[in-house]
Amino acid sequence: MKLSILNLAPVREGQTYLQAVESMVNLAKHAENIGIERYWIAEHHNMKNLVSSATALLIQHTLANTKTLRVGSGGVMLPNHSPYVVAEQYGTLETLYPNRVELGLGRAPGTDMQTAVALRRGRNSLDFPAEIAELRGYFKDSNPVSAYPSAGLNIPFYILGSSTESAYLAAELGLPYAFASHFAPRMMEMAVEIYRKNFKPSTYLAEPYVILGVNAIVAETDKEARQLATTQTLFFLNVVTNAQQNLQPPMASEEDVWKAQMHAQEKPHFGPVDFEEIPIYNQERAVVEQMTACSLIGSPESVDFQLKQLRERVHFDEIMAVSYIFDGVYKQRAKGINHVI
């Protein structure tokens, strides 16, 4: 089984944006040293706690600071961009760093709808298959207009998704499929089964290939790993509540996270009005727990057992690990991720 890394480039509490980028590069360097398969960088917009807004620039910076590591987009949210410009950008990257660039493609906006408008997102996600065909045409140089220097280059394409719709598309195109179970695991088993059942061999890929995104936090003991994982819980709670706080230091325990959230939601009662914060709290917790259900957290032995359980549920070829660890010491982060294999 292969192991790779997805980095959303989070900004830790007390960090500048430049320091967050430096942390991203440091992790990539260590990933290269320990033989990680690939290193992808996400695309997110209008999120002050993530620095992954200009993905192609971050990929170029990472490629420039590593020697052999394959670096890619996890992914390009194609409806946000002109396929022509994407071809030019990634063709240029492949020209500068041959055989090291990968192109993961998704259809989600990676942001809210107001920001999508600011991105000039005028296309519907239903156009996604046509946009992929257009983009691939530029690399094959089969479109009426050429996009240099991408013409004739063979950059690996991957389809990203969190639904069965993306599974059908990846299968139809005969491309590798990366499922976003690190934040949307609900349809994981169904999507992977659909992809494998409907896969059509292509000139690019003879057999189906599945990458599963997982949240991975490994420490010396289960207790230490669970404490480190409170930073992950806080991160997803911020997503649910749209708080957009920077990555927070760990709390003593998971229950402390929810006690603090409950306390933060306490409101004064005015007359007969009784604000029901408990149902809101319960809903937030349920959503966070659902989003993080595909997580490998614990000692190396515990994570190995969890990984075996995951393999019994889903037929995958590669794990792509995301680690929300506040520490910021890249060796510790990469060491923890590496224990997954």
Predicted regions and their residues:
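Conserved, mostly hydrophobic/aromatic
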Residues: L3, A31, G35, E43, ...
